[in-house]
Regions:
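Transmembrane-helix motifs of polytopic, lipid-linked glycan transferases
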Residues: 118, 122-146, 186, 322-327
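Short acidic/glycine- and proline-prone juxtamembrane loop motifs at membrane-interface regions
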Residues: 170-179, 358
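Membrane-interface alpha helices of multi-pass inner-membrane proteins
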Residues: 155, 205-226, 346-349
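Membrane-interface helix-loop-helix junctions at transmembrane boundaries of multi-pass membrane enzymes
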Residues: 8-10, 144-146, 201-209, 244-254, ...
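Short helix- or helix-capping micro-motifs
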Residues: 23-24, 155-160, 189, 219, ...
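Transmembrane-lumen/periplasm boundary regions of multi-pass, lipid-linked membrane glycan transferases
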Residues: 233-331, 355, 402-411
């Protein structure tokens, strides 16, 4: 039997990546602590916990599953500002989003009272801290497999010191998009990984059952957390068919099986209530693009400005990476092209949906841009200008980390 704890699995690269993720976790915990000050109240956070708790208690049925119960001691701000229309069904999220958000509250009973705001904030942030760590680990794994150790480190450092990623993982004045982002990222790259294994001389379904389950979980997490991420479903199929041109039937079968399992898991988030599931689909907004937004220059400026706020390092790194990609033929291969295409699609959807879910699409694009930038940087490190490139990359990463830590200190 091959031992699990081998040097290949747990060596220096894994140790360094783990240290970076610990630094990421420390920053997130700092932000969670600052956001949990007594007297502060995030109405949307209370709403998510309240509605999720009602779903857990009612098992997805009854009036409490759709309409939140008023919090004692608080005004009905949730009803006026956040209560979804369409008979109580959320147009953008399935019950899975609320169930995940309130899972810690289900495991550790804390009353939804004003005096428990600090404890409730820590509980609300716990699932998304985990998603933030998982997305970072997945990002490092994918970038390292595609571009080597250098690409993995560059992508992970950009991720760990990204203000937008930190805010979303710590729920610091940000929507909880970590689960949707991890699901979308996992769906795309798991589909790519599955396609690469189709040429192995083994039975398709049995050999790929682990990846099929992972693809199913990624799809249900993405679409269940944000309905408009249904776009990753056909996108995953497109990558699979492109990468396995002589095994397209097998790729399609795997995709169908993964979608069927994901649909079953999605149905389970409604506690197998067919009527609730059907009404959720009927009242869901799966695209909702505002076509006139594409003719408004302000929409483009807004997306670019928010992208720079999510990761200031991208303001410098992304233009350089794009110029290199389009001017250097060697850089235009699938490993660089795939994350760029996905990021461009998400940013285009963000422009067409200026409010929500546009903000979610912008957040989803950031990890894919990190992979793209890391790939171009790794390619440049293999040229005869390695020393200059290395100095520029290190300078950018150190400056990005220092600026982010300075901004964190200012939060105090």
């Amino acid at each position: 039997m091959v031992p699990f704890f081998t040097r290949e699995r747990f060596g220096r690269p894994q140790f360094l990546a783990g240290c970076l993720l610990l630094a990421f976790l420390a920053q997130c915990l700092w932000l969670v602590g600052k956001g949990a000050r007594p007297g502060t109240l995030d109405v949307s956070e209370i709403y998510r916990l309240e509605r999720g708790a009602a779903l857990w208690q009612g098992r997805g049925s009854g009036p409490d599953a759709n309409v939140p119960v008023p919090v004692p001691g608080l005004k009905n701000e949730t009803d006026s500002a956040l209560a979804p229309e369409n008979g109580g069904y959320d147009a953008h999220h399935s019950p899975l989003w609320y169930l995940i958000a309130s899972a810690p509250l289900h495991l550790r009973q804390v009353a939804l009272q004003p005096e428990n705001i600090r404890s409730l904030h820590w509980l609300a942030g716990a699932p998304f801290l985990i998603f933030g760590l998982l997305l970072g680990a997945s990002l490092w794994y994918v970038a390292r497999r595609l571009f080597g150790n250098a690409g993995g480190y560059i992508a992970l450092v950009l991720y760990c010191f990204s203000p937008g990623i930190l805010r979303a993982s710590a729920l610091f004045s940000a929507e909880p998009e970590g689960g949707a982002a991890w699901g979308a990222f996992g769906a795309i790259f798991t589909a790519i990984a599955v396609a690469h294994t189709l040429y192995a001389p083994r039975e398709v379904i049995l050999w790929n059952w682990r990846r099929i389950l992972l693809l199913s979980l990624s799809l249900v997490l993405a679409v269940g957390s944000q309905f408009s991420l249904v776009v990753v479903v056909p996108l995953a199929l497109a990558f699979m068919l492109y990468l396995a041109p002589t095994r397209r039937i097998a790729a399609f079968v795997i995709w169908i099986v993964a979608c069927a399992i994901a649909l079953l898991l999605w149905y389970a988030s409604y506690f197998f209530h067919a009527r609730a599931f059907w009404q959720g689909m009927v009242h869901g907004s799966f695209l909702g693009i505002s076509w006139p937004a594409y003719t408004m220059p302000g929409a483009y400026h807004q997306v670019l400005a928010q992208l720079g706020q999510a990761s200031p390092a991208l303001v410098v790194a992304l233009p350089v990476a794009l110029i290199t990609y389009f001017s250097w033929r060697r850089a235009r291969y699938f490993g660089n092209t795939a994350p760029l295409l996905v990021a461009v699609l998400f940013l285009a959807l963000a422009i067409g949906t200026p409010h929500y879910p546009g903000l979610g699409f912008q957040f989803m694009a950031v990890p894919f841009l990190f992979v793209f930038v890391a790939g171009i940087a790794a390619d440049l490190l293999e040229t005869r200008h390695r020393q200059i490139t290395l100095a520029a990359i290190l300078g950018l990463l150190v400056a990005s980390a220092a600026w982010n830590l300075w901004e964190l200190a200012r939060v105090a």
